[in-house]
Design a protein with these regions (language model features):
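N-terminal ligand-binding lobe of clamshell/alpha-beta domains
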Residues: 1-225
């Protein structure tokens, strides 16, 4: 925090998406550093966060352009997947020991549904669920999505998932549907969730391939603040 203060920022954009960040907020207060806190629960909240940042840095018009572009992309994907009847069931793993996975009030449930799937723990009306290998096996997901927070993909071996004895009869394991994904596209509630959403659609529906990509129109690069 000393280094942050030394930079004399006009604004610090803080987040509460990672446990323990409250201490940083207290330090910002003590040092009288200007800050805002972004803490979106759903993917749709990110557009409002973009607008909030725009107001804070006096870039309201530009922020509205960015937010509108973000929501337009989401709507394009929703329209592509809305008529999918047989939706695969996804298990998202944030952390392996103990197991943590997103519940109903988390952006990854939104991402799952927009991509034409469901979150197997969406019946928990919370943002974060502490579970067990046995409970996951009982829910028998079609796909396992591994997004360990703060862990690089290269450090995660598929065998860490597939060798779990409790999961040997799970559909996802038997069908080799274990996906090691870049956690920055899924675990951070930011505009990059859109990249993760598009990636997820292609993972779940590979037969659509280029046809799916071509329907997600990108007439221009997203505007920047």
């Amino acid at each position: 925090m000393d280094k942050v203060e030394a930079l004399q920022p006009d604004l610090v954009i803080a987040s509460l998406s990672v446990p323990g960040m409250e201490k940083n907020i207290e330090e910002l207060k003590k040092r009288n550093l200007p800050y805002i806190i972004l803490n979106p629960a759903h993917i749709f909240d990110i557009a409002d966060n973009i607008r909030e940042v725009g107001r804070s840095i006096h870039r309201v018009e530009k922020a509205e352009q960015v937010a509108t572009h973000f929501m337009k992309r989401i709507e394009q994907i929703r329209l592509l997947t809305q008529n999918i009847s047989e939706r695969p069931r996804l298990y998202w793993e944030w952390w392996p020991n103990p197991i943590y996975t997103p519940g109903r009030t988390n952006w990854l449930t939104d991402v799952s549904e927009l991509a034409g799937a469901t979150n197997v723990f969406a019946d928990y009306n919370t943002d974060n669920v502490k579970s067990t290998h046995e409970q996951v096996a009982e829910r028998n997901p079609d796909h396992v999505m591994v997004v360990w927070c703060g862990i690089e993909i290269k450090r995660i071996k598929t065998s860490m998932i597939t060798d779990r004895p409790e999961w040997q009869q799970m559909t996802a394991i038997r069908n080799n549907n274990v996906h090691i994904l870049e956690e920055g596209l899924y675990c951070r509630p930011s505009p990059r969730l859109l990249e993760g959403l598009e990636q997820l659609v292609n993972i779940l529906y590979p037969s659509l391939g280029a046809s799916l990509d071509s329907q997600i129109t990108t007439p221009s690069a997203p505007p920047k603040l």
